[in-house]
A protein has these predicted regions:
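Cleavable N-terminal export/targeting peptides
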Residues: 1-25, 229
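Short loop/turn motifs that connect adjacent beta-strands in outer-membrane beta-barrel proteins
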Residues: 20-23, 47-58, 92-98, 136-142, ...
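Short glycine/proline- and aromatic-enriched beta-strand/turn motifs that initiate or cap beta-hairpins
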Residues: 20-72, 220, 226-228
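Outer-membrane pore/translocation modules
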Residues: 32-33, 56-155, 174-180, 208-210, ...
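Short, well-ordered amphipathic alpha-helices
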Residues: 41-46, 85-88, 191-193
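Outer-membrane beta-barrel "beta-signal"
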Residues: 128, 191-195, 216-229
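Intrinsically disordered, low-complexity segments enriched in Gly and acidic/Ser/Thr residues
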Residues: 155-188, 198
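Long terminal segments
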Residues: 200-201, 206-214, 221-228
Length: 229
């Protein structure tokens, strides 16, 4: 897997499925594809005075990931961890919600063997900007979108999800993802199945699909957890 794929991915895995809520939200998950993995743990904390889904929120994020790519010394194995903190503003209505956030992200990447020409290498601190939201389309259909950009590694990440609430507490749909940076780009499409039982404060989402990328096309799979607090 090219290093730019995961540079773009960690620009924005901080999904906000409850950005319109007054409660806080804990998030955790993992994704695996050919020659790469990604795991994360995050928290979204409402700011003071937030009411009816309108107001400030804070996002905190920790993640660990690995990937392989063909670099200057040959095949390179990368392992990294990252942390970020951001401040955002959200709003909501009867038909959906939206938010915008900005903050700092630190990533520490170890390469074996070392690749001095790599964009992602060592400790790097940069800005991260993100927009996201959801909108009801009617007839139990809901459209969600996320777009983000990370300055230091010049990475972008965007995802579109179309979900149908077929029964109480269950949704099925499709997702489309595009990400990359100056060095490479990738696209992916997959199926998403989400479960959030009525009157419960937790949710679980399963994802699977196929990714097209510069060096290693193949399937991917993932799982996401969310819990209000």
């Amino acid at each position: 897997m090219n290093k730019s794929l995961w540079s773009g991915l960690l620009a924005s895995l901080a999904v906000l499925p409850a950005a319109h809520a007054e409660d806080g939200l804990l998030l955790a998950g993992a994704e695996v594809s050919d020659a790469a993995y990604y795991t994360y743990l995050g928290a979204i904390v409402p700011g003071p005075g937030r009411e009816n889904g309108r107001g400030f929120f804070q996002r905190y994020w920790l993640d660990g990931f690995g990937y392989e790519y063909d670099g200057t010394p040959g095949r390179v194995d990368a392992r990294a961890w990252g942390a970020e903190a951001s401040l955002g503003w959200g709003t909501s209505s009867s038909s959906g919600w939206g938010s915008v956030s900005a903050g700092l992200r630190f990533t520490d990447t170890s390469l074996s063997p070392d690749d001095p020409a790599a964009t992602a290498r060592g400790g790097q601190l940069g800005l991260k900007l993100q927009l996201d939201g959801e909108h009801d389309l009617g007839n139990n259909w809901r459209l969600g979108a996320i777009a983000s950009y990370a300055t230091r590694q010049d990475g972008y990440w965007a995802r579109l999800r179309l979900m149908n609430r077929g029964s109480a507490g269950r949704s099925l749909g499709l997702e489309f993802v595009a990400n990359g940076n100056d060095e490479a780009n990738s696209t992916a499409a997959g199926i998403v199945y989400a479960v959030q039982p009525p009157a419960r404060r937790w949710s679980i989402t399963f994802r699977a699909g196929y990714r097209l990328q510069d060096e290693a096309d193949g399937v991917y799979g993932g799982i996401e957890f969310g819990r209000g607090f």
